[in-house]
Amino acid sequence: MNKVLKNSWALFLGMGFLMMAYGYQGSLLGVRAVQEQFSLTATGFMMSGYFVGYFIGAMTIPNLISRVGHIRVFAAFASLASLVILVHSVFVNPYVWFILRVLTGVSMVCIYTVAESWLNDRSSNKNRGSVLSIYMVILYGTMGIGMFLLNFSSPENYEPFILVSIITSLALIPILLTKKKPPTFKKIKGMPLKELYQTSPFGMVSALFYGTIQSALFTLLAVYAAQMNFSIFQISLVTFLLAISGAISQFPIGKLSDMFDRRKVIVIATFGASLFALFAIISSGQMYLPGELATSKTWFFIFLILFSCCSLPMFSLICAHTNDYIPKEKFVAAGAGIQFTFGLGAMSGPFLCSIFMNIVGSNGFFVFLLFFHALIGIFGIYRMRVRQSVDNPDSQFVAMPSTITPAGIELNPTTEPIEEPKKPEEIPPATNL
């Protein structure tokens, strides 16, 4: 573990700053959109821009990295991300913000790709599982911390946007000053969607639906809380609890999925998330209950934590389930295909959720989450009836962030061994004849 931190501390520190800025930015824009009285559909459309950019970037960035190198690309797009957030405070318009969110999405997928290929290059077959675990803790932990920065200054002011830009710029310093040589970039081709569906229909469909869920969850939760008249501190607490509780639950739920049919664990988790989404609606105070049945926000926080514990491990569960049906040498290609499918769903999530909120009211946010989790669960029950589970000794649960790129998927210790540089053979000393 110490060796992992010693070799990659600059990268971990830089990514920590970036995720802190990312967590802060998401909550900041959501609350500011409510304060500016953007319509719900305009807000959902604007927030979806990030995932459009992420999807576009994932298709185009690998060629750019191959041409100009990791460090230049990282510096260029981290600078772009730092610049773009400042422009939000100058042009307060949902359609301008959509374009800016696209640019942010392109920048972030580029940064993830560079960071994860770098981590992959510095990992060995013995420690890549530890590297992935540390990476996940840093991503979720610093993102949660960033959400609390919402209390720094009112979202109506310029200061929060300046602070996000400063934190993003700080991420450049440890990366650019590292003495380590950048890795040789390796393009990874995802599994064709037709082959992926034939291999694991449940895995592919679940990834598509879960993309809509998670993109809406992380972009519109702050909007929902602001519409429910939560204080700024309560909004930051809500978003923090979502990230941290979901990260903590990855490992116990993952262990259960290794012990039982993974589809059963996914089905139970999705219906559990649907149930706790319903309880969150009831505890929100907008169910027009009699006074003696009214509930406090404390119960809402509890149900949100339980919802997150059921929902956020889903991406890792879907990847592990897909791997159950394929040989080890295809794990990385299948993971890239699952990530591509997840991205397709993510592009539509915020906009679809905003339509639910327009029709139902603020609690349409949780109605949307309930509905799509239930769809995954129902499809899972159907698939269990038409296909037997399999026992693949090469496949096991590995917690992975949904933002992971194909380069990061290779950190999964269950994939094929990565090529490590060979030590030069020792030449025996010359002897007298």
Where are these regions (language model features)?
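Helix-to-loop junctions at the C-terminal end of transmembrane segments
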Residues: 57-70, 154, 249-261, 357-358
